């Protein structure tokens, strides 16, 4: 699971200054890893089923259904490479995999596949527009290097090839709040690196933990920018 949180907080400005600015919408983009379009229960419900030319699977997804009713649902958005790293490269840069720098799933045997440092990503664009930008969960768009914050000169894991990766601040493309990892599939035992590079091992089911972190982030930021 991964998510971009783009919060329209224009810094700590006086109320009059904030009121004079054009109102920007807050944006939360959630992308699971990975669902077929049909495995969302809301596609069989009123208000949704007549908007698409397929039938949803007979599944029960009450939380996703509620989220859909409170969100903007795109009925014809397609990924031309629905694979972990290439898709994230496209999402972040707006480029095809052969241009984003991420044509393959990233691991230590594939230096050819890593998000371009010179790419202007969605986080860069929103940050320049005054947004407070956060990234939560799986990134899997960087070539792993021996840059473990707690063990300089070492990779963040011992298995080979190395899949997991730590993303340093200079490679976060506008995301000023960070709670992420490269790729790690033990979702009952996840880990994350925060904005300052400290590792967290919460011992909690990853979707539940990440959702809680997102909610806390939004609540705290709302209080700061009242």
Question: Predicted regions: what is each one?
Answer:
Residues 1-224:
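Formylglycine-dependent sulfatase
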């Amino acid at each position: 699971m991964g998510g971009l949180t783009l919060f329209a907080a224009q810094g700590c400005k006086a109320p009059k200054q904030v009121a004079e600015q054009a109102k920007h919408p807050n944006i939360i983009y959630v992308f699971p890893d990975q669902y077929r379009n049909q495995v969302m229960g809301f596609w069989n419900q009123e208000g949704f089923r007549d908007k698409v030319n397929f039938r949803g699977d007979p599944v029960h997804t009450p939380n996703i259904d509620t989220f859909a009713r409170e969100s903007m649902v795109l009925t014809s958005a397609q990924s031309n490479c629905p694979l972990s790293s290439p898709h994230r490269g496209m999402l972040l840069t707006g480029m095809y995999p052969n241009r984003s720098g991420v044509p393959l799933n990233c691991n230590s045997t594939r230096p050819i596949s890593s998000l371009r440092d010179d790419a202007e990503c969605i986080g860069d664009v929103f940050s320049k527009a005054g947004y407070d930008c956060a990234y939560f969960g799986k990134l899997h768009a960087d070539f792993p290097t021996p840059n473990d914050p707690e063990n300089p000169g070492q990779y963040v894991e011992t298995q080979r090839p190395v899949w997991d990766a730590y993303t340093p601040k200079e490679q976060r493309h506008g995301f000023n709040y960070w709670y992420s990892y490269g790729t790690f599939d033990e979702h009952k035992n996840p880990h994350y690196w925060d904005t300052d590079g400290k590792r967290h091992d919460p011992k909690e089911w990853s979707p539940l933990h990440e959702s809680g972190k997102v909610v806390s982030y939004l609540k705290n930021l709302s209080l700061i920018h009242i």
